[in-house]
């Protein structure tokens, strides 16, 4: 039994879903009670990057791969210093964590961040349930467990639709970012050559997105989600990046209004994930809540024009509705899993976006060329201003 292997299993834990389903297991991490929308991620590796992705705010993350924690945790694989997810669900926590960068076990890491987790449950059963019924509200209780209280807590969760979480997870202060990608033996590479001044809106930005922009010569100024467009334009940027983030895009009026102003200024714009949805809304399209969303590192996406297929990392529960695209937007990419819209480009402005994660931390970098297209748009703008 897991309890005999880890020492953490002496503390009982339960996961109760709003439909009344109960999963009994053992506690990892903190004790107490947490609630959120329960989703599943199919990635095999990268559990620390997944946990620290701000897009999981108010969500309990189920990892479908059975062995989680094999490599421990470290200070370099965090996408954000804060864990915004409200819980973690796994099958097995291995006895040993083996990696030359390991500094803390997963159990210790969760405890240090005050995050609840539950292990030793049938994650296959849970995943099938979420696949069939859609994402459900759930409550994890660890320590003194009470099924009735957990069920009441789960059913009291308001859900993510209509919830603006971007302003909650966003930075509160403007700051500079000049760290590039990580390299073995040397750590994060500094900005080598400044080619462009880019303002990045932080709606819950993953650090690896910022690193890949720096790799391409972007000197980044990261601003809070609610920063007015006038303040951004006063910084005289060569381009504006719209980050990923959690929650429903529709309530983010401040972001939609700012993007409209930037579009009117013909500013080169690149959006990822939530940023993609916000660009769609600012351009006149609508968004929808998905049944259980896309969460994983093996999602095939096709380029509509070229037919090229790339394997992508995905993490979203909302999507832009292709049937509502106005004439100024063209669909550029589609999911080969369900046909949902994955990319758009303005036909009249230097602005485009992608639903998946081309920076893929964790996951493949098949779509990294999208960063290069952003560079091309900024180069074209610079050439036209000569």
From Swiss-Prot:
Claim: Oxidoreductase is one of the keywords in the record: no
Glutamine amidotransferase type-1 domain sequence ranges: 197-384
InterPro entries xref list: Anth_synth/Amidotransfase, CarbamoylP_synth_ssu, CarbamoylP_synth_ssu_N, CarbP_synth_ssu_N_sf, Class_I_gatase-like, CPSase_GATase1, GATASE
CDD domains, alphabetized: GATase1_CPSase
Pathway participation: Amino-acid biosynthesis; L-arginine biosynthesis; carbamoyl phosphate from bicarbonate: step 1/1; Pyrimidine metabolism; UMP biosynthesis via de novo pathway; (S)-dihydroorotate from bicarbonate: step 1/3
A Pfam family per the record: CPSase_sm_chain
Listed GO biological process terms: 'de novo' pyrimidine nucleobase biosynthetic process; 'de novo' UMP biosynthetic process; glutamine metabolic process; L-arginine biosynthetic process
PROSITE patterns referenced in this protein's UniProt entry, alphabetically: GATASE_TYPE_1
Matching SMART domains: CPSase_sm_chain
The entry's keywords: Amino-acid biosynthesis, Arginine biosynthesis, ATP-binding, Glutamine amidotransferase, Ligase, Nucleotide-binding, Pyrimidine biosynthesis
Residue numbers spanned by region CPSase: 1-193
Annotated L-glutamine binding sites: 55, 245, 247, 274, 277, 315, 317-318
Annotated active site: 273 (nucleophile), 357, 359
Gene Ontology MF annotations: ATP binding; carbamoyl-phosphate synthase (glutamine-hydrolyzing) activity; glutaminase activity
Annotated EC: 6.3.5.5
Catalytic activity: hydrogencarbonate + L-glutamine + 2 ATP + H2O = carbamoyl phosphate + L-glutamate + 2 ADP + phosphate + 2 H(+)
Keyword Ribosomal protein (UniProt): no
Biological function: Small subunit of the glutamine-dependent carbamoyl phosphate synthetase (CPSase). CPSase catalyzes the formation of carbamoyl phosphate from the ammonia moiety of glutamine, carbonate, and phosphate donated by ATP, constituting the first step of 2 biosynthetic pathways, one leading to arginine and/or urea and the other to pyrimidine nucleotides. The small subunit (glutamine amidotransferase) binds and cleaves glutamine to supply the large subunit with the substrate ammonia.
Quaternary structure (record): Composed of two chains; the small (or glutamine) chain promotes the hydrolysis of glutamine to ammonia, which is used by the large (or ammonia) chain to synthesize carbamoyl phosphate. Tetramer of heterodimers (alpha,beta)4.
NCBIfam families: CPSaseIIsmall, PRK12838.1
Family, similarity comment: Belongs to the CarA family.
Protein name according to UniProt: Carbamoyl phosphate synthase small chain
Organism field: Teredinibacter turnerae (strain ATCC 39867 / T7901)
Gene: carA
């Amino acid at each position: 039994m897991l309890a005999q292997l880890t020492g953490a299993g002496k503390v009982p834990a339960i996961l109760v879903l709003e439909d009344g389903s109960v999963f009994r297991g053992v506690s990892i991490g903190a004790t107490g009670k947490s609630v959120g929308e329960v989703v599943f991620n199919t990635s095999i590796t990268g559990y620390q990057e997944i946990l620290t992705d701000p897009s999981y705010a108010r969500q309990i993350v189920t990892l479908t791969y059975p062995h989680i924690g094999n490599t421990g945790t470290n200070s370099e694989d965090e996408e954000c210093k804060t864990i915004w997810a409200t819980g973690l669900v796994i099958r097995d926590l291995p006895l040993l964590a083996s990696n030359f960068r390991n500094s803390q076990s997963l159990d210790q890491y969760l405890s240090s961040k005050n995050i609840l987790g539950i292990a030793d449950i049938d994650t296959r059963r849970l995943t099938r349930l979420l696949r069939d019924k859609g994402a459900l509200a759930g409550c994890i209780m660890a320590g003194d467990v009470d099924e009735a209280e957990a069920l009441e807590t789960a059913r009291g969760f308001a859900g993510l639709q209509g919830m603006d979480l971007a302003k909650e997870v966003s930075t509160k202060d403007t700051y500079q970012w000049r760290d590039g990608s990580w390299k073995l033996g040397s750590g994060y590479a500094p900005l080598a050559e400044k080619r462009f001044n880019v303002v990045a809106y932080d709606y819950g930005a993953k650090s690896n997105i910022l690193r890949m922009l720096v790799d391409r010569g972007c000197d980044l100024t990261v601003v809070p989600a609610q920063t007015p467009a006038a303040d951004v334009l006063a910084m005289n940027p060569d381009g504006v990046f719209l980050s990923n983030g959690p929650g429903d895009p529709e309530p983010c009026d401040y972001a939609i209004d700012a993007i409209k102003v930037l579009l009117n200024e013909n500013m080169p714009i690149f959006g990822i994930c939530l940023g993609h949805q916000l660009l769609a809304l600012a351009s006149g399209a609508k968004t929808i809540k998905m049944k259980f969303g896309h969460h994983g590192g093996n999602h095939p996406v096709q380029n509509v024009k070229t037919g090229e297929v790339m394997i992508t990392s995905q993490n979203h529960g909302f999507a832009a509705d292709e049937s509502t695209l106005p004439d100024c937007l063209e669909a550029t990419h589609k999911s080969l899993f369900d046909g949902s819209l994955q990319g758009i480009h303005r036909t009249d402005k230097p602005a485009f976006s992608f639903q998946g994660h081309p920076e893929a931390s964790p996951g493949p970098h098949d779509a990294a060329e999208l960063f290069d297209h952003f560079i091309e748009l900024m180069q074209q703008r610079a050439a036209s201003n000569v």
